[in-house]
Amino acid sequence: MSTPVIAASTTAALSTPTTAVPVIALDHVNIEIDGHALQVPKGSMIIQAADKIGVNIPRFCYHDKLPIAANCRMCLVEVEKSPKPQPACATPVMEGMKIHTQSERALSAQRNVMEFLLINHPLDCPICDQGGECELQDVAMGYGRSVSRFTEDKRVVADEDLGPLIATEMTRCIHCTRCVRFMDEIAGTSEIGGMGRGETLEIGTYIGRSISTELSGNIIDLCPVGALTNKVFRFRARPWELVARAHIGYHDSLHSNLYLHTRRGEAMRAVPRDNEAINESWLSDRDRFSHEALTHPDRAIKPRVKSGGIWRDADWPGAISFVKDHLREITTLHGADQLGVLVGGTASAEDYLLLNRFARGLGSNNIDHRLRQLDFSDDMARSLAPKLSAPLADIEHARAILLMGCNPRYNAPLLGHRVRKAWKRGAKVYAINPADFDFHFQLEQKLIGHAQNQVGYALALAKAAAEASATAAPAELAPLLTGALVSDNARAMIDSLMANQPSRILFGEHAAQHPSAAVLRACAKFVAAVTGAGFDEIPDTSNAAAAWRMGAVPHRSVGGVSVATPGLNARQMIEQPRRAYILCAAEINDFALGNHVLEAIAKADCVIVIGSFVNPTLETLAHVILPSALPPETEGTYVNAEGIVQTVQAATKASVDVRACWRILRVLGAEMGLPGFVFNDYAELHAELTEALALNLAQPGVCELSVPARSHERGLVLQALTSIYSTDAVLRRSAALQATVIAAKPAVHLHPDDALGIGVSAGAAVTLGSAILAVEIDRSVPKGGFLVAAGLDSTLDLPITGSVVQLQKR
């Protein structure tokens, strides 16, 4: 029988056989693969050694990121002195081992396995989404028979609904169990398994429900056949019609690497792009499926100007002239300080740089990107930008981790994956959080409390650190520690952080957006300093690290240079309304102050929206809308939590009248005669940006810390938490993500004891502000508090986190 094409091409690529060389390293062994001598680490599997030298061994169940299962047997090879072929994925190398992957014995075994795998596989290739990129197709071409000898009835498996993201055709399943192992080992949710045995084995969920992990889309990539496919992409295009464009995810501060697959400029799907330093070979669901919002009906596609309360389409020169005239009038009559610039967290570094130039060029220092932040009292003590203390990949090697106001599963899913890897290696994980989040790892100790109690827990932790290390707390923090009550849990956390090195403290978005964030941050930094732990401040929005560096804060300009007269921060710009606002890449849902934003902006004489989406609320408030491109539609630079700078090119085409934000600002700045807006193209702007990103001129000072007096009002303490799929305008418009079981629903989450205290049960309605919300009984909520999802249209009218609220039963 002729040698398969796959095997033949591999054989041709090998070098001339050589004799084995002596062992040099004690932890290595000498082996031979198809006459090719090499040294490999002890404990390596044959398939790993073969991959190292480019020898292709067919496989279905093996994946280098998953535990070995040896289910499919497709990788059978001949090992000299072994009585039968051995699975290359599960056979460890041994000194002097000689392996043959192309011998007649090996090829016969592989062909036989291939025949068995195809016995029950349907001939769906013409209608299967996997066609053209299917591992089974590829291997069958090399090792399959042209005619099947099987004449019995094929089995048929009923499909299961795994939710809005993953389509199932389980008759195609070959039982490789990649999806099962991914859920068990990587996602940590164990939602999929094999039921039955032999030919009756079926892969499915244990209790027949949708998958709830935030990493579920990865099983689409792992599936070697068409059993699990992308439901959003289903039947939309063939792989050979698509062009792969390198890009990044922009919904958290990790900036996972990905490819956007486009057809004629339209995004069809997203798949992971390997980068071991950031996302390995995985992708979160929100980075994978959010692209469907690029063509949402809410997209702003033409410049529009409001005249006499009526919206009309305008051309770009007319819209720019409108903005120029109104800004000139307001700044001339009322002063430049009457301009407030509020920008979202998904803008590019170029956008932040030019917004900083534009605002300060007009004479206003009122610019901020921290729309969800409530406490700005330690601004002058901050470093250049929030970032990790060490490479992201090092987190998985930590021996102790403290999560402070951090839910890495939802804040940054692939950061949560790193924490899980550390836990699996024996790391002890601790938490001080506003809720008992459903982690995919176990906590050694936890302090769960509502917003007021979290401050007490942080102070107790800092005091325990001071006592354990015999170190005096900083002058600004010391007075607050006097009355702190140190618990055994706090002492245990400190002892573990000191004893288990390296250790890390992950300071998350729930801490950064706390009404006493400065105190929490000071406590975390002090604990890190005395225990030797790394202090990792995770940026709470996608490109916050770039926004800080490019001066999108009121007290610093580019490179962290302090300004002589700091402007108003985001909260002050709302509490002290301005006459003119520029809203760039931001919606009302992005603010912590909710209804106060509506009231403040409604009073303005001119509201300029530079954004990608419009809705009735924005149309009511705005006077001019300048449609801007989304990150996949334009070039831009992004800085992730580790400080890695990545510049991407446009992957998809924007509508004809949509412009990149930096282009809009360039024309607007030039029209207004401001300095720094005359450059010919993106290359010139990027060169300036590169120089600016290299600067670190921040001079952190000291700050005064205080804790608000504890409220003794009757009621429950509110904690507003932004949902995993509500963090930005794009995610809020991704229909598939909003249909998942982990997407937040408008509800009040109450501890059972508190629900009993106010006389409500699950499903009952309560009034919160102007909203009427259903009650959900949730034991993860601390007693004395309640949780509400922020970022939703129905929860805009919320008091701020930490407010004491009396819920009214309907």
Question: What positions do the PLM features span?
Answer:
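Short, structured coil segments at secondary-structure junctions
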Residues: 362-363, 425, 441-443, 523, ...
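A glycine-rich, hydrophobic/aromatic-adjacent loop/helix-cap motif
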Residues: 503-575, 719
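Long hydrophobic segments that form regular secondary structure
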Residues: 264-281, 286-296, 300-306, 315, ...
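Phosphate/pyrophosphate-binding active-site segments
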Residues: 444, 455-512
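A generic structural motif
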Residues: 364-378, 426-436, 530-546, 604-615
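A cross-kingdom feature strongest in bacterial/archaeal respiratory oxidoreductases
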Residues: 2, 57, 62, 338, ...
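Short alpha-helices
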Residues: 434-435, 441-474, 517, 526, ...
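N-terminal export/assembly segments and adjacent metallocofactor-ligating motifs
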Residues: 2-12, 16-45, 51, 59, ...
